[in-house]
Amino acid sequence: MAQKGQLSDDEKFLFVDKNFINSPVAQADWVAKRLVWVPSEKQGFEAASIKEEKGDEVVVELVENGKKVTVGKDDIQKMNPPKFSKVEDMAELTCLNEASVLHNLRERYFSGLIYTYSGLFCVVVNPYKQLPIYSEKIVDMYKGKKRHEMPPHIYAIADTAYRSMLQDREDQSILCTGESGAGKTENTKKVIQYLAVVASSHKGKKDTSITGELEKQLLQANPILEAFGNAKTVKNDNSSRFGKFIRINFDVTGYIVGANIETYLLEKSRAIRQAREERTFHIFYYLIAGAKEKMRNDLLLEGFNNYTFLSNGFVPIPAAQDDEMFQETVEAMSIMGFSEEEQLSVLKVVSSVLQLGNIVFKKERNTDQASMPDNTAAQKVCHLMGINVTDFTRSILTPRIKVGRDVVQKAQTKEQADFAVEALAKATYERLFRWILSRVNKALDKTHRQGASFLGILDIAGFEIFEVNSFEQLCINYTNEKLQQLFNHTMFILEQEEYQREGIEWNFIDFGLDLQPCIELIERPNNPPGVLALLDEECWFPKATDKSFVEKLCTEQGNHPKFQKPKQLKDKTEFSIIHYAGKVDYNASAWLTKNMDPLNDNVTSLLNASSDKFVADLWKDVDRIVGLDQMAKMTESSLPSASKTKKGMFRTVGQLYKEQLGKLMTTLRNTTPNFVRCIIPNHEKRSGKLDAFLVLEQLRCNGVLEGIRICRQGFPNRIVFQEFRQRYEILAANAIPKGFMDGKQACILMIKALELDPNLYRIGQSKIFFRTGVLAHLEEERDLKITDVIMAFQAMCRGYLARKAFAKRQQQLTAMKVIQRNCAAYLKLRNWQWWRLFTKVKPLLQVTRQEEEMQAKEDELQKIKERQQKAESELQELQQKHTQLSEEKNLLQEQLQAETELYAEAEEMRVRLAAKKQELEEILHEMEARLEEEEDRGQQLQAERKKMAQQMLDLEEQLEEEEAARQKLQLEKVTAEAKIKKLEDDILVMDDQNNKLSKERKLLEERISDLTTNLAEEEEKAKNLTKLKNKHESMISELEVRLKKEEKSRQELEKLKRKMDGEASDLHEQIADLQAQIAELKMQLAKKEEELQAALARLEDETSQKNNALKKIRELEGHISDLQEDLDSERAARNKAEKQKRDLGEELEALKTELEDTLDTTATQQELRAKREQEVTVLKKALDEETRSHEAQVQEMRQKHTQVVEELTEQLEQFKRAKANLDKTKQTLEKENADLAGELRVLGQAKQEVEHKKKKLEVQLQELQSKCSDGERARAELNDKVHKLQNEVESVTGMLSEAEGKAIKLAKEVASLGSQLQDTQELLQEETRQKLNVSTKLRQLEDERNSLQEQLDEEMEAKQNLERHISTLNIQLSDSKKKLQDFASTVESLEEGKKRFQKEIESLTQQYEEKAAAYDKLEKTKNRLQQELDDLVVDLDNQRQLVSNLEKKQKKFDQLLAEEKNISSKYADERDRAEAEAREKETKALSLARALEEALEAKEELERTNKMLKAEMEDLVSSKDDVGKNVHELEKSKRALETQMEEMKTQLEELEDELQATEDAKLRLEVNMQALKVQFERDLQARDEQNEEKRRQLQRQLHEYETELEDERKQRALAAAAKKKLEGDLKDLELQADSAIKGREEAIKQLLKLQAQMKDFQRELEDARASRDEIFATAKENEKKAKSLEADLMQLQEDLAAAERARKQADLEKEELAEELASSLSGRNALQDEKRRLEARIAQLEEELEEEQGNMEAMSDRVRKATQQAEQLSNELATERSTAQKNESARQQLERQNKELKSKLQEMEGAVKSKFKSTIAALEAKIAQLEEQVEQEAREKQAAAKALKQRDKKLKEMLLQVEDERKMAEQYKEQAEKGNAKVKQLKRQLEEAEEESQRINANRRKLQRELDEATESNEAMGREVNALKSKLRRGNETSFVPTRRSGGRRVIENADGSEEEVDARDADFNGTKSSE
């Protein structure tokens, strides 16, 4: 998993740094040296390179020391490429074998990466040091992430299980398995830590009363259980001496609602006895080291060496302080809710256990009775346990036992007393542990919420092999066998059964990991009974011992394959069991006692009656334990049926543990298990050391390789059809029609739409199965799709909201218009008199109704007040009743609680008594029945014994000698028959193996035939060689960059070191301050807690009062709101009345005015006025009275209302103040409490963190110092590597020769196969000769056996005669002696025959063993080939997936290409349109220029007329005489001239306006032209960029074509070397390829030249553009300045025409200056000087204009000055003419230059375009030519590859046939080995073998003929291929002439098909290349 940037310190232990993985040196070594793994005695496996192959042996050179070693081919294992170094999931390894897995684990372990995925489970190697990968930051990193998104970690396993539990609603379990010391307990703690953070129940919850308490207690349960249940062993400093299953319950939302812990088999014997260098349970050492003085005195504690039960005294644990751990344990007990009294009681029991070990007994002198000379330790024990010393001593030394109906005292021996004390200590500690566990479970399950599902975590003692292995080790190893069996069954059996159940094509694989035999050896109840059943059976026998148990075990299970008796017996109680992790030697001493676990009833009854309540509670259920005292009543003889225990009978430890384990396994089977395989790296507990053989043994035992293999080959991810459709239908929305219901068909349609590779999935009956990684890919696609959908939805929502807001604004606009219209209407209406009258009269109509409304309101108000009083009285009564009822309810609840507790206790007592009674009754009945059976059996046996004794006495004397001889012969016969039977069984076994091998051979043949079709795809791997050169070059650059980075990092590390030193000193000071603050805060916290309790009590009372007050307030607020509404209505009525009053007053005033106005009209009007005034006065009086009465009423109501409101507000304020005070006190207290707790927690954490940081900084400082030195060394090494890599790049070419050597090797293999064929024929002949020899020997043996059989028959007949004639033995004594002598001679001959027979049997067995060894070797080679075949299948699947991905890329690229073509056509259309528009604009500009020239010509004509008029005026002035003409004529002429001058001015102004319009049009055209030019330049630039991009693409394509051509050439060379027969045919292709390469190189050179020319043109074009842009900028500036000057000159023109001409001349000069600036940048300085001159000239003209204005004003007054003015004007006119002529000539010259530059620019642009187009066309033509060459070469290569494939196929078929013959020969060997059976069977087999050999020879001859035919067809095909190539070169003919042979015709047809495939592949090939 590549990480960006620099990895942090904690991430270094999680992520793999990819910069150090892709080493070019390692890659080169792997490719060049053919690196493999070979076995090593030290490292397990070593890297080596293959140097030479010698048949079945290979010579390799070790990489480490260069030593050459010869090893077998079967012992070599393939090495993975370097890119798979430190791979996170070992299922990704291409070569899966033990060496690769071990190497990967070793590399990751040495890099600090302890977690590694192994398929579906995780492997963790114990680092034996602290790693920074368990912080809160790491927890946040893994929270909610998918497994493939993060590196391997225990957090990832926990999160996966947690998410699966929530998503699938299935219970989960996490099983941490492994040997002792592998790290199971630590990983269990990390899982709980992660779940406590992720599934915290107080997040987002309202019930903050138990904020985080449950999670805190869950985390603190581990320290308590570890203190009381863990101990230091040889392998592990913190070994769990009990097993536990932690069940964490979750609700539906995923929050923790409770937990429960179950424990298994506490090793209580450790409390009294420990092995060397081991400790007892941690709590004993914690207590002695951590207890303070007062506690030491209370608990009577002593030193470590004063306790007998501490066998080794004080044994320290590295990096752990016992006193600190004691404090942590006490704190954990406090958090779990243990009171101080309970803690003290627990520690008292611990101390009493230690004191029990100090009680010493001695044997009295004359008797065996034990005595206690010193009872000091006993007094301490009794003081701690609260019992009487005398009673305790009596119970131990002289306990009371029941004999019959009497109770007597029995004196105990020293050994019995010691055993009783030790048993009491063990039982006490076990009961204490159980009590602690129940107390922890009670604390963890106090929420009483129902859990929807649970997640179980199993932490159980790992597999143990010690020097002395006892009963505890057997139980632990038995548990591990069951767990490993569960793993095997889940991973291998259930997985494959589900494949078959779902109908998936799957060949069942037997991984050979069945552990059932070993489990049955331990747990089987009968037929024959297992270890536990035999142990329980022996416990029933009173005289049974451990030796008798072992003897019976050897008798029953002696032949079991997993049971062994040690060869060298140290003790008769030893036996061995072969577990999955190895052979374990068990010592069965004291097993019967441990299994029965007896106790002294006298002591237990004492403890039950202890004065210490805690001790009595521990022993309260002592009566339920049925001791073994009843066993003494049994008779001496017992039946074997006693092993069957019935319900209610005595339950042994083994039975209880077996049942408990069965329940655990049932629970685990009902969950979905997640396995974590913990690996122990070494037994020295050293970090950084890895014992290869130890790790390999654990990997083999744990089934790691098999788990990876089934994960790779199988389909581990599966999902139900409906869920798959529901979850991933979004990815194929249109694939399923609406209303489609069939789930399976829907999934098939979705899969087709998703275009998944068929090899990646399988569709079953109810589920769809996927390979690893496919579902993760689909999840990523789904997330992307959902993101797009959400974005589209958000866009639609925003659009809807925008439209809605727009509609709302439109409605507001219409409303505003309506309001405006109404306001305008009102403004028009308000001044209308009738409207004013209407508004004044209308309110008066409602005055009469106000009195009635007021009266009704008063009545209503009175009723409301009465209801309020009544409600208040009822409220008080209800409050009183409520308080009474609540008190009664509390009393009833207390009584009910007491009753329920009493009932529960009574029920529990009743159940216990009933169970006890039932047990005792059943035992009694069983004993009585067995006693009767035993008595009957005893009587029968006695009678039979007497009869047998009599018979034996009769026969003993007669048959002593004959019986001895007969037994001897019988033994020999039995042994011979057993050997023959064994040989027959071996023959049957070999037959089965032969059949099995033949089936496997068929399977392998089918697989190999499938693989041969896909061999062409495998050949593509050779292409990787050509890419190595590029990779090495990139590696060199990367190494240089890394070197620089290393130097920077070294400097940063030095800075960091200095910074760390300063921080360390600061942290020391902070630690001291924090410790002081912690002490102060603890004091404050205690005080605040007391205050908080008191405040909470007050708060509860006040909350009840507050609730009542709030109810009153709500009711009063309702009344207030009603009154407020009434008051508002009254106020509104009053306002209306006042308004009416004002309106009436205004109306009265209006009427007065009207009356005053109309007073003088008529008398009738006066009368009306008087009447109106009277009415008005009456109305006024009435109105005043009403207002007064109304005001009085309102005043009264206001007073009443204010009184009520004030009372209510006072009450409300009081309640509010009380509530505010309470809330304030509550908040302050809660805040202070939370702050103090937070500060305390933070300070504690800070202290720990500071200490941790201190240690970490010290470590980092050392590491930094070492890194600095390492960095210097690495820098030097990197410099050397850079030089080496440059040399190694050159060595890559050597790899090509190796690849060519592979092809040559194929030819050699063909020759070797021919030689092997001859060898097999010779072997076959030898086998037949050996078979004949064996058959002759067997015939001889059979004859001898028949003779022996006849002799045996004769002896049997003689024996029968002897038995019939026993009575006549005395008479025939002499005859019998003779017969006996003959018999002795025959016995000797039989002895000699037996010896010969035995020798021959030994020779046959030796041959059998040799054959068996050969068979094992073949089996090994078969397994290796099977593994390689599996790896090839996996690689084939990967290649297919790559091909499908490339096809998808090809389709995408075709789409992109079509889009690019559309865009290019679009751009071409736009370019044409822009050129057309530019042409139109140019024509418009030319027409405007012509119009401008016409306007200038008109202007020039006007100037000429003006000049003529001036000349006439001069003539007139010159023609006047001195006295001349009179003034009247002069004035007349003056007026005429002035009128003419005015007319000329108007004409001039009109012309100027026209000129101005034309100039404006010209400016607009220039601006438009400028914009068009800018747009055209942008388009041109965009096209240039596009062309540049296309050029780059073409260059890339050319480069890729070069690489492809190089690949094709190399492959062609390889093919030519592989098949020498085709060399002549392929020479033409090589020549063509060389010519193509030369053409390509010439094209590349031409392309480089064109590129250089293009760059030159581009530079020139860019320079021209830059100069043009600068000219345009200066021109714009000058235009702006010119416009300002034009404005000034316009004002001057109005005053004087002469100044106008000067302005125009200056303007012309300005325009000429601008054009001169546009033409050349070199004349910029001259133009600036010219501009300054013109500005000076303009200023001068302005001064002259002022003077001329003064002259014009003076000319009206003084005519005399006209002559001077005319002369002055004529002079100025002459000068102006000369300057105008100069400017005109300069302007024309600049215009010519501008036109020339424009034409040059256009010519250059046209030339550049034409050159660019021509270069593009040339390049495209070259590319097309090269593509055609590549296509032609590809077609030729495909044809050659096709022919090569067909020859390879034929060759492989021949190889397979040869292999079949070899296998058949081996089969004959095996059949020859079966010659140990009967002679007839051997003869029949020999005849069958001869027939089979003849048939094989016929087949071989037939195969030889077929081989000859195949070679002839190959030659014919070669000729036809040459003909086809010649036809393909011509390319005219499309059909081929068939040859004579049918094989030739098939080749031609295949060639046709291959041509089509070649065309299709070429098209795909070109598409993919262009896409790249």
UniProtKB/Swiss-Prot annotation:
Domain of life of the organism encoding this protein: Eukaryota
Modified residues (Phosphoserine): 8, 23, 40, 1684, 1722, 1954, 1971
Positions of region (Actin-binding): 661-683, 763-777
Gene3D superfamilies, alphabetized: 1.10.10.820, 1.20.5.340, 1.20.58.530, 3.30.70.1590, 6.10.250.2420, Kinesin motor domain (3.40.850.10), Myosin S1 fragment, N-terminal (2.30.30.360), Myosin VI head, motor domain, U50 subdomain (1.20.120.720)
Pfam families, per the entry: Myosin_head, Myosin_N, Myosin_tail_1
InterPro entries per UniProt: IQ_motif_EF-hand-BS (IPR000048), Kinesin_motor_dom_sf (IPR036961), Myosin_head_motor_dom-like (IPR001609), Myosin_N (IPR004009), Myosin_S1_N (IPR008989), Myosin_tail (IPR002928), P-loop_NTPase (IPR027417)
Chain positions recorded as ATP binding sites: 178-185
GO biological processes: cardiac muscle cell development; elastic fiber assembly; myofibril assembly; skeletal muscle myosin thick filament assembly; smooth muscle contraction
Annotated region described as Disordered, given as residue ranges: 1744-1802, 1866-1972
Annotated coiled-coil segments of the chain: 844-1934
A cellular component term, taken from the record's GO annotations: muscle myosin complex
Domain (Myosin N-terminal SH3-like) ranges: 31-81
Phosphothreonine found at: 1177
Molecular-function GO term, any one: microfilament motor activity
Record's subcellular location: Melanosome; Cytoplasm, Myofibril
Entry remark concerning the domains of this protein: The rodlike tail sequence is highly repetitive, showing cycles of a 28-residue repeat pattern composed of 4 heptapeptides, characteristic for alpha-helical coiled coils. Limited proteolysis of myosin heavy chain produces 1 light meromyosin (LMM) and 1 heavy meromyosin (HMM). HMM can be further cleaved into 2 globular subfragments (S1) and 1 rod-shaped subfragment (S2).
Self-association and partners: Muscle myosin is a hexameric protein that consists of 2 heavy chain subunits (MHC), 2 alkali light chain subunits (MLC) and 2 regulatory light chain subunits (MLC-2).
The name this protein goes by in its record: Myosin-11
Species in which this protein is naturally found: Oryctolagus cuniculus (Rabbit)
Lineage: Eukaryota, Metazoa, Chordata, Craniata, Vertebrata
